[in-house]
Every structure is written in C-alpha cells, then in structure tokens.
C-alpha cells in the first residue's frame, strides 16, 4: 500500500480515527491526571469528542469511496448515519453526567466505553465486508455489555449485564455462522463479490447464511423474536445507559441491516423480504401488546423500542429508495422522542433516589408544567399521533410499504399503531389527571433542558421536516 493510498483510506475514516485516538487519550488523561475534577473533565471532553466526530463526518470527509481493500465505504448513507449517531451519543453523554455524579458512578471508564461503542457503531454503518461488519459489531457490543452492568452495587444492573452478555454471545454466534456460510458459498467476504455471487444464480447455501445473519442483526435491533433481553436490560441498566441503548446502537444496527440486505443481497429481495416481513409483524405485535401491562416506565420504553423497530423493518422490507429514506427519517424522529423521554425520566428524582414507576408520573403537569408538557408531546410523537413529527415518520414508513405493494403489512402497521397509542395515552392520562404526593428534587439544568427541547422539537421540527426528508431522499437516491 502506497503512502497516497494509505492517506486516502485514512481520510475516509476520520470520524473513527478521531474517536479511537480520543478514547486512548481520555483513558491516559484519566489515569495520569489525578484530582477531584478529572472525571468531569473527561466527561466534557467526551461530549466534545462525540460532537467533533459527527461534524467531521458531515464536513471534513470530502467525497466518497472505499477504504482498506474495499472493507469500508464512505458514502451518503455513512455520512448521514455517522452524523446522527455522533450527535445523539453526545446528548446521551450530557444526560449521563448529572446521574453519574449523583449516584457516585463518575468513573473515567464510563465515557471511554461510550466512545469505544460509538467507534464500533461508525464502523458498522461503513462496513462493506463481513469481517469489517463483525469487527464493528463486537467493538460496540463489548463496550455495551460493560455499560449495562456499570453500577456494580446494583443487583439488577449486574443481572442486566449478564443477560445481555449471554444472549449477545448467542447472537454473535448466529451471525458468525451465517457469515461463514455466505463466505463459503460466495468465496469472498466483500459485499461487492457477494453481490456478484448472488446475481450469478440462486444458491441455497447463501440463502441459509443470510437468514442466520438476519437473526444475528435482529438481536442487535431488539426485534422479535430476538427481543427477550430488552425489557430486563432496559429496566436493570442505569437510566442514562438505557437512554443510550435506545438510540444510537439501534440506529447503527438498523442501517447496517438495511445495507446488508439492499447491497450484497439486493438481487434476491424476494428471498429475504418474507423473513423481514414476519419479524416486523412480530415486533409490532410484541411491542404493542407487551407494553399494555407494564408498570415500570423503563420496561414500557423497552417494549416501545421493540414496536418501533418493527416499523423500521417495514421500511426495510420495502427494499426501495422510498423505503431507505423513510427508514432514516423515522429513526431520526424516533431518537428525538426516545432521548427526550429518558431525559424526563431522569428528571424524576426524589431525595431517596430515582423513581421508575408509571404511577410516579402522577400529577407531573401540575408539579412541573414544563416537564409535563414535554412528556406529553414526546408520548404523542413516539405514538405517531397526528400533527407531531413522529406521525410523519410512521406515515412515510407505511407509504413505502404501500408503494412496494406490501398492503397487508401496511394495514397491520396501522392497526398496531392504534393499539400502541393506548399505552402512550395511558401515560398522558397519569400525567394530567392523576394526583400524587411524591416531591421531586430539582433536576440538573442540562437534563431539564434536553427534555424541554426534545418536547418542543416534536412540534418545532415540523417546519424543517422537509429538509430532513430531502437529505434522507438524497441518500436513498444515491444508493439505490
């Protein structure tokens, strides 16, 4: 490899290099710089590092191309995804800082693990090879396993981390087995070579391998029936970790799944569409009905996440330009709702500690009108109620399904959305019409304003929704 080639390859991976180098620097800074303010300094530097990586993906990387023997690709999809992942991870880190201080968990390892996880996510959305894909997934997963059990004094957190690790190892095994089958029958791990092998004729080995790969990736997006870990991990993990789990990793995994299906296996849509179709329906059903009986708001958000990944898979099943841009718009709007909802949950702290029951939201509109209005708007948006930005996210997904002649899937998506609205409205009812004697202590300024801004964004984003759709449409147009 010549110096020019190496320079070209590295220039396409500037965001990953910024994060990887930054993680090592933060680790050394935390070890060698002793003092009371070291943890807070590392946390603030992490926020800046994540934002810098997002901006680097948006502005610094010029052009598009392949890197390192076509193992990684930087295209419009990678640019869009890395920007979104970096920004939402920075916001999640801002949410975590007051919590870590209050719970005496302000160790330097937390921000370093977040940076390493985001590095893996950015590798995932740029993967153009099965080995590169697996490297990104494992870098992300190994960091997330530790984050889930970060509060070692909590039995629930330790249990969550263990469950996540065991089931994650199982999903990695499925993914590796599928990848080995694909490699064996295609003769290559590169997406381009796999696409040529797929186009040359039907091969049952490639199809079986793809099914295993889909199962492994379905675990990463917590799609049914590979969702078993989600409610327990969401409930047991520290709340800011749950907020992180619900946003950036889901975005990275669903984009990777879409890339794998639409690029190397784009010629055999009819062979994998039915699998995605079934997983989407199961996810929407499990999420909608599972959430109806939940009393813990973090478990409810877990089922909400499962359901929303079902809607995202509806867009993937469309396997079209419309499906791809609808997927990106839906996921961005979902992340706005999810991060705002968890900011509100983090604002509900009494003198004894965090509260997590839905009943604890009672009377929130009277005790704290700002948070009450924000949570109401966020629930309406995630539920897809009309005139909120979340409604348009679901509308575009269903439109993509209709355009792809998936009429039954579109109808089921509408029906499950109606069922899902019930548990979002239940939360709104508790906020506005129930009463409670619980007194919350004032929340951190950053947490409070993230909740407020996210709530306002569910309405204020409507004027810029056209710009977001245009950007996502440009990505779909360039790729398919």
Curated annotation (Swiss-Prot):
InterPro entries: NADH-Q_OxRdtase_suN/2, ND/Mrp_TM. It is found in: Cell inner membrane. It holds the Pfam family Proton_antipo_M. GO terms for biological process: ATP synthesis coupled electron transport. It is an enzyme of class 7 (translocase). Keywords: Cell inner membrane, Cell membrane, Membrane, NAD, Quinone, Translocase, Transmembrane, Transmembrane helix, Transport, Ubiquinone. The keyword Translocase applies. NDH-1 is composed of 14 different subunits. Subunits NuoA, H, J, K, L, M, N constitute the membrane sector of the complex. NDH-1 shuttles electrons from NADH, via FMN and iron-sulfur (Fe-S) centers, to quinones in the respiratory chain. The immediate electron acceptor for the enzyme in this species is believed to be ubiquinone. Couples the redox reaction to proton translocation (for every two electrons transferred, four hydrogen ions are translocated across the cytoplasmic membrane), and thus conserves the redox energy in a proton gradient. HAMAP family: NDH1_NuoN_1. This is NADH-quinone oxidoreductase subunit N. The gene is nuoN.
């Amino acid at each position: 490899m010549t110096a020019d080639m190496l320079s070209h390859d590295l220039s396409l991976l500037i965001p990953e290099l910024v994060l990887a180098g930054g993680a090592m620097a933060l680790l050394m800074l935390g070890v060698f710089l002793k003092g009371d303010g070291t943890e807070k300094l590392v946390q603030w530097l992490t926020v800046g590092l994540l934002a810098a990586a997002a901006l680097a993906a948006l502005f610094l990387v010029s052009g598009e191309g392949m890197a390192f023997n076509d193992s990684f690709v930087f295209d419009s999809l990678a640019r869009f995804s890395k920007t979104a992942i970096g920004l939402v991870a920075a916001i999640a880190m801002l949410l975590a800082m007051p919590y870590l201080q209050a719970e005496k968990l302000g160790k330097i390892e937390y921000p370093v693990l977040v940076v390493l996880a985001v590095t893996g996510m950015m590798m995932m959305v740029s993967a153009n090879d099965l080995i590169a894909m697996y490297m990104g997934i494992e870098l992300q997963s190994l960091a997330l396993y530790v984050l889930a059990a970060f509060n070692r004094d909590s039995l629930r957190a330790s249990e969550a981390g263990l469950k996540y690790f065991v089931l994650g190892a199982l999903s990695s095994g499925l993914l590796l087995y599928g990848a080995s089958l694909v490699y064996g029958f295609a003769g290559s791990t590169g997406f381009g070579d796999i696409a040529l092998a797929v186009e040359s004729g039907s091969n049952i080995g490639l199809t079986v391998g793809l099914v295993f790969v889909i199962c492994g990736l379905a675990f990463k997006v917590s799609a049914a029936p590979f969702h078993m870990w989600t409610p327990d991990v969401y409930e047991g993990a520290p709340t800011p970790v749950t907020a992180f789990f619900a946003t950036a990793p889901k975005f990275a995994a669903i984009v990777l799944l879409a890339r794998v299906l639409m690029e190397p296996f784009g010629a055999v849509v009819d062979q994998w569409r039915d699998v995605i179709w079934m997983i989407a329906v199961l996810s929407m059903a499990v999420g909608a009905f599972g959430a109806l009986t939940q009393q813990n708001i973090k478990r409810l958000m877990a089922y909400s996440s499962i359901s929303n990944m079902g809607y995202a898979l509806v867009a993937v099943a469309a396997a079209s330009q419309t499906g791809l841009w609808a997927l990106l718009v839906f996921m961005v709007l979902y992340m706005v709702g999810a991060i705002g909802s968890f900011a509100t949950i983090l604002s509900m702290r009494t003198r004894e500690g965090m509260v997590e029951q839905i009943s604890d939201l009672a009377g929130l509109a009277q005790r704290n009108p700002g948070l009450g209005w924000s949570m109401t708007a966020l629930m309406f948006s995630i539920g897809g109620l009309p005139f909120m930005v979340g409604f348009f996210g679901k509308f575009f997904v269903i439109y993509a399904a209709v355009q792809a002649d998936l009429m039954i899937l579109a109808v089921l998506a509408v029906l499950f959305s109606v069922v899902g609205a019930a548990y979002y409205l239940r939360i709104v009812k508790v906020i506005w019409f129930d009463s409670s004697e619980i007194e919350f202590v004032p929340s951190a300024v950053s947490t409070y304003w993230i909740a407020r801004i996210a709530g306002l964004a569910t309405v204020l984003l409507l004027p810029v929704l056209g710009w977001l759709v245009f950007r996502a449409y440009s990505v779909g147009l360039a790729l398919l």
